[in-house]
Amino acid sequence: IIEVGAGYSSALMLDCNQHYFNNEIEFTFIEPYPKRLKGLLAAGDSTKHRILEKKVQQVEVQEFEKLEAGDILFIDSSHVLKTGSDLYYLFFQVLPRLKKGVVIHIHDIFYPFEYPKEWAMHGRNWNELYFLHALLVNNHKLSILYFTDYIAQVHTNELDKCPLLKKSRGGSIWLKIENSNG
């Protein structure tokens, strides 16, 4: 798993790796300010996993080309697409080079591809999900595996099976590369 933007989600993944996967999953965390991440690491985590203390734009694209089918690129970055930004690099340099079968998680994506009203009212002027929506329209290279907010809003009866998700349904989308240029 390569995670762009590290923090509490990193800790959750590391815990799941320990409890359910016998610590067999290797992580690369790309985080220019890893103080929080380092504080969350358990003894031994730093020897098994890598932390690249730099902006994702400074990471060679070849790092992402190492991902194989079933591997995960987990994106929780600035959420803003603009000149020279992390998202610009990820969407235009990294995603087109990913191999068939690579799974992509993008955090803070809501259905129907609109941010919560409260976020806009409090100055979260993100634009990531608008660009993602445009990218997905008529795109046969990417398929949607799971869209948490869509399930929560459209298939509410399914959430009855998972009552904790009703409290905090989150906002993320899981995609899969179906055809590859890389």
Regions found by a protein language model. Give the residues of each.
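Catalytic metal-binding/acid-base residues of hydrolase active sites
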Residues: 7, 33, 78, 110
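Conserved class I S-adenosyl-L-methionine
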Residues: 1-7
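S-adenosyl-L-methionine
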Residues: 30-74
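Conserved SAM-binding loop of SAM-dependent methyltransferases across substrates and taxa
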Residues: 8-20
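Short beta-strand element of Class I
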Residues: 22-28
